[in-house]
């Protein structure tokens, strides 16, 4: 009788190590780019939200001939302000259904009068603090 040699099926240790090294290199190249894109997407989303709030502020101004004061804040776009200066006309249902938070979960900052225009509207960015550079830079309505 002939003895048959059984061939083992599987990968050698060297083959497995080569695959692990290749996957590690790919992860080192891809992960930083993906993480950076997420922050870019959040910054873009904040800029879009600022534009939407600006549109609501313009509708408010068209109805009442003025922008909400800093004391009234952006809440004046959701509910009619009860502190002066009260708007002469106020749209039923407000100008926004609710105030959005920025992509990092913080409220937008609104100041009237603004340092850069009739009002300043901005997100504090990823760091949650005014000013900053890079990913922590504020997203504003004037830049």
Question: Across the structure, where does each feature detected by a protein language model lie?
Answer:
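Short beta-to-alpha loop/turn elements within the nucleotide-binding domains of ABC transporters
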Residues: 11, 29, 72
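Short, glycine/small-hydrophobic-rich surface segments
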Residues: 57-98
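Alpha-helical hydrophobic helix detector
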Residues: 17-33
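N-terminal leader/signal peptides at the extreme start of proteins
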Residues: 1-11
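Short, surface-exposed interaction loops/tails
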Residues: 3, 40-44, 51, 55-58, ...
């Amino acid at each position: 009788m002939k003895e048959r040699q059984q061939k083992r099926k599987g990968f050698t240790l060297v083959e497995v190590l080569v695959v692990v090294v290749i996957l590690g290199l790919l992860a080192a190249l891809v992960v930083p780019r993906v993480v950076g894109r997420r922050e870019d997407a959040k910054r873009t989303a904040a800029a879009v939200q600022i534009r939407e709030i600006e549109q609501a502020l313009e509708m408010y101004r068209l109805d009442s001939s003025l922008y909400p004061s800093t004391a009234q804040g952006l809440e004046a776009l959701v509910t009619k302000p009860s502190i002066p200066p009260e708007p002469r006309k106020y749209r039923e249902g407000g100008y926004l259904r609710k105030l959005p938070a920025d992509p990092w979960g913080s409220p937008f900052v609104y100041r009237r009068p603004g340092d850069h225009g009739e009002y300043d509207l901005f997100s504090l960015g990823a760091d949650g603090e005014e000013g900053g550079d890079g990913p922590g830079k504020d997203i504003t309505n004037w830049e």
